Structures are given as C-alpha cells and as structure tokens.
Curated annotation (Swiss-Prot):
Similarity comment: family membership: Belongs to the IspD/TarI cytidylyltransferase family. IspD subfamily.
Catalytic activity: 2-C-methyl-D-erythritol 4-phosphate + CTP + H(+) = 4-CDP-2-C-methyl-D-erythritol + diphosphate
Name of the protein in its database record: 2-C-methyl-D-erythritol 4-phosphate cytidylyltransferase
Record keyword Transferase present: yes
Gene Ontology biological-process entries: isopentenyl diphosphate biosynthetic process, methylerythritol 4-phosphate pathway
Swiss-Prot/TrEMBL keywords: Isoprene biosynthesis, Nucleotidyltransferase, Transferase
Site positions (Transition state stabilizer): 17, 24
Upper classification of the organism: Bacteria, Pseudomonadati, Pseudomonadota, Betaproteobacteria, Burkholderiales
NCBIfam families linked: ispD
Molecular function (Gene Ontology), one example: 2-C-methyl-D-erythritol 4-phosphate cytidylyltransferase activity
PANTHER family: 2-C-METHYL-D-ERYTHRITOL 4-PHOSPHATE CYTIDYLYLTRANSFERASE, CHLOROPLASTIC (PTHR32125:SF4)
Signal peptide interval: none
Annotated site, Positions MEP for the nucleophilic attack, chain positions: 159, 215
Gene name per UniProt: ispD
Amino acid sequence: MTPRLFALIPCAGTGSRSGSAVPKQYRTLAGRALLHYTLAAFDACSEFAQTLVVLAPDDTHFDARRFAGLRFAVRRCGGGSRQASVLNGLLGLGEFGATDQDWVLVHDAARPGITPELIRTLVAALKDDPVGGIVALPVADTLKRVPAGGDAIARTESRDALWQAQTPQMFRIGMLRDAILRAQREGHDLTDEASAIEWAGHTPRVVQGSLRNFKVTYPEDFALAEAILARGTNAS
C-alpha cells in the first residue's frame, strides 16, 4: 500500500516576539490571515489526505470563517511547547486513518511564503527515503558568536556546511512520534522535528528551500511578508 501524505500545522503559539496582542498566525497580511496562506498552499496539493491544525485549548482568536473554502481539520490539543503540540497532533492523525508508515509534513503556521511547488519538491525528493528530511537553505551570512547577555563579538564562526532549517519537515508518522517520545523521556525539548529524528539516531536529508519561505517572527517581518504575499495575490 502506498503511504499517504498528511500535513500537520502546529498553531498553538502566542507569537510573543512579534510585538502584537493578536497571535501572529491570525494577523492580516495582504487581505488575509497569515495562517490562510499556509493552509491554502497545502489545500492546493490534492494528494494530501488531510491537513490538521493544532490549536491551543484556550485559543479565542481562531475563526473558521476566515478560512472558508479550504480543506483542513482543527483539533484543540496544543501543548506547552512546539514539541508537545506536534506529538499531540501526530496522535490525533490516527482519527483520520493515518498509520505509522504514512508521511507527515510538519509546517510552521508562521511561514506563509510556502508554495505548493516547494511542498511537492520536498515530497518528490523524499518519498522513497527511509528517514525523510527537511527544506533548508545554506547559511549565506557571516556568523558571529556573542556571549549571552552581552554585545561583544567573541569570535567568528565558520558557515561552511551550515544550513538554516525551514519547514515543512517530512517524516514517517511512527518514526517521528517515537523520536519525540524518546526525547521527552530523556528530558529534551527540541525546537524542530529533525532534531528529534537526529536524537533518535537517524540522519534526515536536506532539500533546497526558498528565501520567501522565511518565518515571520519580529515586527519588521510582517512588512516583508506582506510585500511578498501581495505580489503573489496580484499575480494570480
């Protein structure tokens, strides 16, 4: 049986660094909620069996009417960290018939620049891989190490062989679930799915990502994201 594809969007964060009282995934960019662009990209990929959005149990900002016409499901099972939210979402995918051998693509809600083309490029590159992998970009900037709390450069770090991780991150549901459970048992709260897979002793692959697929994090990021998204909206 051919493994199926599922998408998982952890959306339980508060976006504290974005400088807004409204979680960043619900901020309006180019006429739509930021989250809309992420959901629309996966909705355009009809090969996915389901897209599951994981919300915080007490989320009062989500309004399904803002995403009318898009195919996705919502479960209010978010945890206290990204890792916990992803784990709960993986467990929730079983409700939609997902098995351990099916693929899941975990994507940050705050990366609205994702495109169906990039999603399909990742799937095509990894669908026969025994582990899976992520989209990422080679580090282009010079890296400086600065001690915590300071502002003086301690040294320059080599950027050779360094890649900046993005999402989606694509792994078998069972492998990712077991890797996260192991990390939790051993007291590690990891910031992305590939880290959990690495912790379990596997070697994920990298697939070339895109500059437009950046994570909206700080207040100044919204203007850049809006410019990119507005251009795409006008082009369509």
